[in-house]
Amino acid sequence: MQMHQHNDQPETESMIEKAHLKKRYILASDFDQTLSFNDSGYVLADLLGISEAEFERKATGMAKLNLVQQGGELAYLLLHDPEFHSKVRPEHLREAGKRVRLKPNIDALYRFLSEEVEDYHFDFYVISAGPVEVIRSALEGIIPADHIYGTEFEYNSRGEIERILQVTAGYGKVAVVDQLLEKLKIGPDRIVYVGDGSSDIHVMLHINRRDGFTIAVSENKYLAPIAKRSVISDSALAILIPILEEVVGWEPRLIRELFESKGLLIQQWDKVQTDMLTIVPVSTPVEERSVVAVEE
């Protein structure tokens, strides 16, 4: 699994050349609570001096009105809510990105998928409904900026948000996935998508229908039944497990050996199947019926 390249060839060119010789896949991942521990909307609200409770009230209210696609609530608030719109500037979005708490080993995940899996190459992209400035700032030096898709704004001369150019929420994620497939000339069965919440439902259904592979990193009651695999971990590298098992076809022993060769130990690996049940009393109790014996 060791990489070899000529000294006179730039690393990026070597990676591209090798990618053409391997089975090429796209790994597309959500950002908030998929590659991070917290929601960037809360981080931005705190930076702007807006309380967590107030932000939650506004975002929840937007979601209930169904005016925007799920996941697009923050973009709508930044443009239309007076409190957000009057305060936020591009520099605030970039600073919020620096304050987002990332899951560990994202850089190792990117490197593994690009270089370490023999006969396979995964192009790693991030597709999020969050502002693209936040995500690119958070992942600076880890994932190339042109591999990150998020909600884009147009600003006026004062740095105020004037309009939304693109919202990558709901069906917006579907559009980005299809653009990537067309751009990279990859079949729809060679895409892996990773997400955590309701805003990922449309894109997961779209990918499943076309024989792609989907992974949930939460126990969201709407998403978990849709995803082909679920994995819960504090490490971004956990995403590798279902990919290596289901896509590459490795056995657990080989996966453990790969991790150990990189100085990592899979300390706990519990395979569970979760049944989600709600059990309540029946609305109308069944009346007991007496049995009468009739003698002739």
Model-derived regions, located:
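Alpha-helical substrate-recognition element adjacent to the catalytic core
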Residues: 2-152, 157, 230, 234
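C-terminal cap/substrate-recognition subdomain and adjoining C-terminal extension
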Residues: 97-296
